[in-house]
């Protein structure tokens, strides 16, 4: 958990105490305070209501409020812990914690499993992996032939689906990740280790600030 000793932790009206959030995450109090500045910037980019809606989240992640993106939608759904269609500051900090370099392998593995388990069945199915792969390729502007995508899916399930039931359960996914740690690269944002030295450059992109002004 983060170092949460502070003599002058700021209070954020209508939001959770930074000391409390630091005690529950890998962030220090000063890092939580820096995250609050980021949260304010994102949450006011479209509607200034102290909450992050899906449009603001997509704008922060991908600089584009018009283009729907499955990956962004899934991340938003996982951040939206209370299922209200918006993200409050507490959920924002706790959810970002899984991307911290000090977050455990277990936390990161669980998050990626839920990311791919789009139907919330407790299993990752081939079509879910295909949808996510296509979404990630589109976002990176990479193009792969359909047969290449199918080959990737075949190899993934050959390696991960140990009991050959056509789906990947949590145990199979955990073992697959251990053998293929590169799968978790997206789950670590190094600058989360000390946001206070990188803010305001720590932001998914700088366009949020430009739109807010």
UniProtKB/Swiss-Prot annotation:
<dbReference type="GO" id="GO:0009414">
    <property type="term" value="P:response to water deprivation"/>
</dbReference>
<keyword id="KW-1003">Cell membrane</keyword>
<dbReference type="GO" id="GO:0005886">
    <property type="term" value="C:plasma membrane"/>
</dbReference>
<feature type="binding site">
    <location>
        <position position="128"/>
    </location>
    <ligand>
        <name>Ca(2+) 1</name>
    </ligand>
</feature>
<feature type="domain" description="EF-hand 4">
    <location>
        <begin position="148"/>
        <end position="183"/>
    </location>
</feature>
<dbReference type="InterPro" id="IPR018247">
    <property type="entry name" value="EF_Hand_1_Ca_BS"/>
</dbReference>
<dbReference type="GO" id="GO:0005509">
    <property type="term" value="F:calcium ion binding"/>
</dbReference>
<keyword id="KW-0479">Metal-binding</keyword>
<feature type="binding site">
    <location>
        <position position="165"/>
    </location>
    <ligand>
        <name>Ca(2+) 2</name>
    </ligand>
</feature>
<dbReference type="GO" id="GO:0009738">
    <property type="term" value="P:abscisic acid-activated signaling pathway"/>
</dbReference>
<dbReference type="InterPro" id="IPR002048">
    <property type="entry name" value="EF_hand_dom"/>
</dbReference>
<keyword id="KW-0449">Lipoprotein</keyword>
<feature type="binding site">
    <location>
        <position position="172"/>
    </location>
    <ligand>
        <name>Ca(2+) 2</name>
    </ligand>
</feature>
<keyword id="KW-0519">Myristate</keyword>
<feature type="site" description="Involved in dimerization">
    <location>
        <position position="140"/>
    </location>
</feature>
<keyword id="KW-0597">Phosphoprotein</keyword>
<protein>
    <recommendedName>
        <fullName>Calcineurin B-like protein 9</fullName>
    </recommendedName>
</protein>
<dbReference type="GO" id="GO:0019722">
    <property type="term" value="P:calcium-mediated signaling"/>
</dbReference>
<feature type="domain" description="EF-hand 1">
    <location>
        <begin position="31"/>
        <end position="66"/>
    </location>
</feature>
<dbReference type="GO" id="GO:0009536">
    <property type="term" value="C:plastid"/>
</dbReference>
<feature type="binding site">
    <location>
        <position position="117"/>
    </location>
    <ligand>
        <name>Ca(2+) 1</name>
    </ligand>
</feature>
<keyword id="KW-0106">Calcium</keyword>
<dbReference type="GO" id="GO:0019900">
    <property type="term" value="F:kinase binding"/>
</dbReference>
<dbReference type="Pfam" id="PF13499">
    <property type="entry name" value="EF-hand_7"/>
</dbReference>
<feature type="lipid moiety-binding region" description="N-myristoyl glycine">
    <location>
        <position position="2"/>
    </location>
</feature>
<feature type="domain" description="EF-hand 2">
    <location>
        <begin position="67"/>
        <end position="102"/>
    </location>
</feature>
<feature type="binding site">
    <location>
        <position position="121"/>
    </location>
    <ligand>
        <name>Ca(2+) 1</name>
    </ligand>
</feature>
<comment type="function">
    <text>Acts as a calcium sensor involved in abscisic acid (ABA) signaling and stress-induced ABA biosynthesis pathways. Contributes to the regulation of early stress-related CBF/DREB transcription factors. CBL proteins interact with CIPK serine-threonine protein kinases. Binding of a CBL protein to the regulatory NAF domain of a CIPK protein lead to the activation of the kinase in a calcium-dependent manner. May function as a negative regulator of stress and ABA responses.</text>
</comment>
<dbReference type="InterPro" id="IPR011992">
    <property type="entry name" value="EF-hand-dom_pair"/>
</dbReference>
<feature type="binding site">
    <location>
        <position position="119"/>
    </location>
    <ligand>
        <name>Ca(2+) 1</name>
    </ligand>
</feature>
<keyword id="KW-0472">Membrane</keyword>
<comment type="subunit">
    <text>Homodimer. Part of a K(+)-channel calcium-sensing kinase/phosphatase complex composed by a calcium sensor CBL (CBL1, CBL2, CBL3 or CBL9), a kinase CIPK (CIPK6, CIPK16 or CIPK23), a phosphatase PP2C (AIP1) and a K(+)-channel (AKT1). Interacts with CIPK1, CIPK3, CIPK6, CIPK8, CIPK14, CIPK16, CIPK18, CIPK21, CIPK23, CIPK24 and CIPK26.</text>
</comment>
<keyword id="KW-0677">Repeat</keyword>
<dbReference type="GO" id="GO:0009860">
    <property type="term" value="P:pollen tube growth"/>
</dbReference>
<feature type="domain" description="EF-hand 3">
    <location>
        <begin position="104"/>
        <end position="139"/>
    </location>
</feature>
<dbReference type="GO" id="GO:0005737">
    <property type="term" value="C:cytoplasm"/>
</dbReference>
<feature type="binding site">
    <location>
        <position position="161"/>
    </location>
    <ligand>
        <name>Ca(2+) 2</name>
    </ligand>
</feature>
<feature type="binding site">
    <location>
        <position position="167"/>
    </location>
    <ligand>
        <name>Ca(2+) 2</name>
    </ligand>
</feature>
<keyword id="KW-0938">Abscisic acid signaling pathway</keyword>
<feature type="modified residue" description="Phosphoserine; by CIPK23">
    <location>
        <position position="201"/>
    </location>
</feature>
<keyword id="KW-0346">Stress response</keyword>
<dbReference type="InterPro" id="IPR045198">
    <property type="entry name" value="CNBL1-10"/>
</dbReference>
């Amino acid at each position: 958990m983060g170092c949460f000793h502070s003599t002058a932790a700021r209070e954020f009206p209508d939001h959770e105490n930074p000391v409390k959030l630091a005690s529950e995450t890998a962030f220090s109090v000063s890092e939580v305070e820096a995250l609050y500045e980021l949260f304010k910037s994102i949450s006011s980019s479209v509607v200034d209501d102290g909450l992050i809606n899906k449009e603001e989240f997509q704008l922060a992640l991908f600089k584009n409020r018009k283009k729907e993106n499955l990956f962004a939608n899934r991340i938003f759904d996982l951040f939206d812990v209370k299922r209200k269609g918006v993200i409050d500051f507490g959920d924002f900090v706790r959810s970002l914690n899984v991307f911290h370099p000090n977050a455990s392998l277990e936390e990161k593995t669980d998050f990626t499993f839920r990311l791919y388990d789009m139907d919330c069945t407790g299993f990752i199915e081939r079509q879910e992996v295909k949808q996510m792969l296509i979404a990630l390729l589109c976002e990176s502007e990479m193009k792969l032939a359909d047969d290449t995508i199918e080959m990737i899916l075949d190899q993934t399930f050959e390696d991960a689906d140990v009991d050959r039931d056509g789906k990947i359960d949590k145990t199979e996914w955990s073992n697959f990740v251990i053998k293929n740690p590169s799968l978790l690269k997206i789950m670590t944002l190094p600058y989360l280790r000390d946001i206070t030295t990188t803010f305001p450059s720590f932001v998914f992109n700088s366009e949020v600030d430009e739109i807010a002004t």
